[in-house]
From Swiss-Prot:
The lineage of its organism: Bacteria, Bacillati, Bacillota, Bacilli, Lactobacillales. Residues 36-46 have a biased composition (Low complexity). Residues 1-130, 147-200 are annotated as: Disordered. Its EC number is 3.6.5.4. This is Signal recognition particle receptor FtsY. Its main location: membrane. GO terms for cellular component: cytoplasm; plasma membrane. It comes from Streptococcus mutans serotype c (strain ATCC 700610 / UA159).
């Protein structure tokens, strides 16, 4: 919403202010014209009232003059009536006073009527003038409203076009934001292999670093007790007994040369020796032996180490690289293994070759190799049994599988990969030794490295068996597997310790 407000909030406020200003102008125009009409009406009423008052005044004057003429006429008749009695002569002034009083009362009444009539006429005029004024007022108001209404369609059309344009922009912005969010989520979800190494080896690095820091914090003198404590610390870090012994002897030699007397110097020498042990002859042979046509990979290992899961993840990896992949379920004596591999095939959308229950594993493999050749498959992955407790039968089974594969492809299998669980520590080294006696191994798959602090077993395997690690599992996600790179591994294992 913040972007939306930045892009469109200001524009909508301007549109709203424009509409409000038009309505206010119309109201002001009506308000300004209303007093003018009232003033004009008032002037008309005043002029009419003045004319009326003038007429009333003239009529009053005429009435007063008539009353005086009557009075004068009566007075002129009094001398002609001189023959009346004295009593009548005495009563005449009284009658005259009464007439004068009556005349004055009549004049006052006329004046009162004169004063009353304008107000009554005003009251009478107001009903007569009010309809005309209100009619004119409403006519002007209707005219102004009509003007406003005539302007509204154009403004409404403009507002609708602007609203449509803003809605289109809003939609485009929402789409762009969703695309950006999706791309950012994808970018966040897609880690580089170096980042995966750092993440997955965090526990191993933290455990080894904590032990090394605790050891150096208790540093006293470089004596025999010091070397014994150092060897114990390395063994607890799962680097193996042979690696611990070799490193301790090398450090004794360095101490004699007085190159390792201080804690920081000791720390550097220990890490340098660990790197030298893994580097060895500089030949790692970590690359997969891919062929130009069909590459056959044979997977061996005990049950529960993540062998079938690793096959499914690698199938997903290679399929997304554009390669044609096929799987073979040769662990026919364990129904769960066949079902698990079939489920992985469904998930990653690759074909899986299976046989009947308790079928000969070699026959299922032979069928799978022939199908792979006929379908121009790039990579064929074969899942085998892991019954290490019955070494003789397992050895015979693996030898037979190798023979039937060579009938179709003489130089196959091109890779025989042993899957090891890194969390088992030194037990993984024991399994590697046992399987190397049963069948020739070309490489190792190290799984569950992210959930353990025993990643140092790689150094032990490298030191004692000279078998390269070719794949490493970083976690539970479908893409959490990759080719092993020794430099990235050692950096992830030892980074931050110096």
């Amino acid at each position: 919403m913040g972007l939306f407000n930045r892009l469109f909030g200001k524009k909508r406020q301007e549109e709203k202010s424009t509409t409000d200003s038009i309505e206010e102008a119309a109201e002001q125009e009506v308000t300004q014209e209303k007093p003018a009409l009232l003033a004009e009406t008032a002037e008309t009423a005043e002029s009419q009232q003045s004319v009326y008052e003038k007429d009333v005044t003239e009529s009053q004057a005429e009435q007063v003059s008539d009353a005086r003429i009557i009075e004068d006429g009566q007075n002129s008749k009094e001398p002609a009536a001189s023959g009346h009695s004295v009593q009548e002569h005495k009563q005449q002034p009284v009658q005259h006073q009464q007439e004068v009083f009556h005349s004055e009362n009549s004049v006052a009444a006329v004046q009162n009527n004169t004063e009353t009539m304008p107000s009554q006429q005003k009251k009478d005029e107001k009903p007569n003038q009010s309809p005309d004024f209100m009619a004119e007022y409403y006519a002007r108001k209707a005219e102004l409203a009509q003007k406003v209404e005539s302007q509204k369609p154009a403004e409404t059309a403009e507002q609708e076009s602007q609203t449509t344009l803003s809605d289109q922009k809003e939609t485009e912005t929402a789409v762009n934001q969703s695309e950006e969010e999706a791309s950012s989520q994808i970018a966040e979800s897609v880690e580089s292999e170096e980042e995966k190494y750092n993440r997955s080896l965090k526990k191993t690095r933290t455990g080894f670093g904590a032990r090394l820091n605790a050891f150096l914090a208790n540093f006293r003198n470089v004596d025999e007790e010091f070397f014994e404590d150092l060897e114990e610390m390395l063994i607890l870090s799962d680097v193996g007994v042979q690696v611990a012994s070799t490193l301790t002897e090398d450090l004794r030699y360095e101490a004699k040369l007085e190159k390792a007397k201080k804690p920081e110097a000791l720390r550097r020498v220990i890490i340098e020796k660990l790197v030298d042990i893994y580097d060895k002859d500089g030949q790692f042979n970590e690359k997969i032996n891919f062929q130009n046509d069909l590459t056959v990979m044979l997977f061996v290992g005990v049950n529960g180490v993540g062998k079938t899961t690793s096959i499914g993840k690698l199938a997903y990896k290679y399929k997304h690289q554009g390669k044609k992949v096929m799987l073979v379920a040769a662990d026919t004596f364990r129904a769960g293994a066949v079902a698990q591999l079939a489920e992985w095939g469904r998930r990653v959308d690759v074909p899986v070759v299976t046989g009947p229950k308790n079928a000969d594993p070699a026959s299922v493999v032979y069928d799978g190799v022939e199908r792979a050749v006929a379908a121009d498959v790039d990579i064929l992955m074969i899942d085998t049994a892991g019954r290490l407790q019955n070494k003789d039968n397992l050895m015979a089974e693996l030898e037979k599988i190798g023979r039937v594969v060579k009938r179709v492809i003489p130089d196959a299998p091109h890779e025989t990969l042993l899957t090891l669980d890194a969390s088992t520590g030194q037990n993984a080294l024991v399994q590697a030794k046992e399987f190397s006696k049963i069948t020739p191994l070309t490489g190792l798959i190290l799984t569950k490295i992210d959930g353990t602090a025993k990643g140092g077993v790689v150094l032990a395997i490298r030191q004692e068996l000279a078998i390269p690690v070719k794949f490493i599992g970083f976690g539970e996600k479908i893409d959490d597997i990759g080719e092993f790179h020794s430099e990235d591994f050692m950096r992830g294992l030892l980074e931050g310790l110096l």
